[in-house]
UniProtKB/Swiss-Prot annotation:
Record key words, sorted: DNA-binding, Transcription, Transcription regulation
Protein known as: Transcription elongation factor GreA
Gene3D superfamilies, per the entry: Transcription elongation factor, GreA/GreB, C-terminal domain, Transcription elongation factor, GreA/GreB, N-terminal domain
Stated role: Necessary for efficient RNA polymerase transcription elongation past template-encoded arresting sites. The arresting sites in DNA have the property of trapping a certain fraction of elongating RNA polymerases that pass through, resulting in locked ternary complexes. Cleavage of the nascent transcript by cleavage factors such as GreA or GreB allows the resumption of elongation from the new 3'terminus. GreA releases sequences of 2 to 3 nucleotides.
Lineage: Bacteria, Pseudomonadati, Campylobacterota, Epsilonproteobacteria, Campylobacterales
Biological process terms in GO annotation: DNA-templated transcription elongation; regulation of DNA-templated transcription elongation
Superkingdom of the source species: Bacteria
Name of the gene encoding the protein in the UniProt record: greA
MF GO annotations: DNA binding; RNA polymerase binding
Xref: NCBIfam families: greA, PRK00226.1-2, PRK00226.1-4, PRK00226.1-5
UniProt keyword Transcription regulation, yes or no: yes
InterPro entries noted in UniProt: GreA/GreB_C_sf, TF_GreA/GreB_CS, Tscrpt_elong_fac_GreA, Tscrpt_elong_fac_GreA/B, Tscrpt_elong_fac_GreA/B_C, Tscrpt_elong_fac_GreA/B_fam, Tscrpt_elong_fac_GreA/B_N, Tscrpt_elong_fac_GreA/B_N_sf
Organism: Helicobacter acinonychis (strain Sheeba)
UniProt similarity note: Belongs to the GreA/GreB family.
Record HAMAP family: GreA_GreB
Length: 164
């Protein structure tokens, strides 16, 4: 069983989605299926088949979210030392091949948003950097090949998960 590290924010987000699916979406789709069933022949009833497909999606998502929750390892990144790259660390790195600087915060997979600089602990970048210290150089496999990155800084700052 693989533990899924995440912040309390990520855990609450998954729990809220699961609650919405179980308490709102699931009952609504049952009603939609009943209404569509009343429209006659099920073999050629597009509404019925669409509702059943939606029901399969909802049930599969409920299973997925339940599994994530059961494997969740809620971590308070503010309570961790950030002298080495770890969950919740914000890191500044320098691509030694092109002198470009990047800043990322390592979060759980359900919280990641690369466009906002939030990368999953399971991403190739995070995997290559976790456990390293300021000044270390890491080779990271990128889609266009391998590049060397120097860790310029490691620190903790409150993670902004702005949902907008």
């Amino acid at each position: 069983m693989n533990r899924e590290p995440m912040s309390m924010h990520g855990y609450n987000k998954i729990c809220a989605e699961l609650k919405q699916l179980k308490e709102v979406e699931r009952p609504n789709i049952v009603k939609e299926i009943d209404i569509a069933r009343g429209h006659g022949d099920l073999k050629e009833n597009a509404e019925y088949h669409a509702a059943k497909e939606k029901q399969r999606f909802i049930e599969a998502r409920i299973v997925d979210l339940s599994e994530i929750i059961s494997n969740a390892q809620v971590i308070d990144p503010g309570a961790l030392m950030h002298n080495k790259v770890s969950f919740g660390s914000t890191i500044k790195i320098l691509n030694l091949d092109n002198d470009k600087e990047f800043s990322y915060t390592i979060v759980g997979s359900v919280e990641s948003d690369p466009a906002k600089g939030l990368i999953s602990f399971g991403s190739p970048i995070a995997k290559s950097l976790i456990g390293k210290s300021k000044g270390d150089v890491a080779s990271i496999q990128l889609p266009n090949g391998e590049s060397d990155f120097e860790i310029l800084d490691i620190y903790y700052k409150e993670i902004c998960f702005d949902e907008n």
